[in-house]
Amino acid sequence: MNKIDNPAATIFEKTAIYKEINRYSKYYKHFKFRSKGELALSYYVIDAFTDTKFGGNPAGVVINENLDEEFMQKFAEEVRFSETAFIKKIDSKNFDIKFFTPTAYVELCGHATIASFQALFDSGAIEDNNTYFMKTLAGTLAVEVN
């Protein structure tokens, strides 16, 4: 269902919304991609470690429950960030997060972790002053949001 058989032929429509935020990453961009009417996918581009637009270290973040790893890899290759994080909510305190470079599925990424929890916070999925857990290839790690 989410599989792209011919990524070279995929046509994407982009719309961007810019919003300032006042946490680890001050600026983010939110895009929506539509692939030939089959899949609408929203993702964030969050600049970690900065308080200025287009500064810091950018990471892509996708919050989606139903993406397979083949699609995640192709998407990361398409958007070409050093890392793109794909988040699946397990329950209110636990998240499965997969990190992809344009060429590989990797164990962990620091700036993409910060970007992931910023996206979760901005989307209302998590709250300030709480501890959450993320399952990654590197194991299950605690993340404090405050």
Model-derived regions: residue spans:
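Polybasic, lysine-rich low-complexity intrinsically disordered segments
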Residues: 2-4, 14
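Aromatic (phenylalanine/tyrosine) cluster motif
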Residues: 12, 18, 24-33
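N-terminal, positively charged, Ser/Thr/Ala/Gly-biased leader segments
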Residues: 33-54
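Short beta-strand-to-turn element immediately C-terminal to the catalytic PLP-Schiff-base lysine
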Residues: 61-64, 87-88
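Short, conserved charged micro-motifs
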Residues: 67-73, 108
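Anion-binding (especially nucleotide phosphate/pyrophosphate-binding) glycine-rich loop
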Residues: 74-106
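Acidic, low-complexity central loop/insert segments
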Residues: 94, 100-146
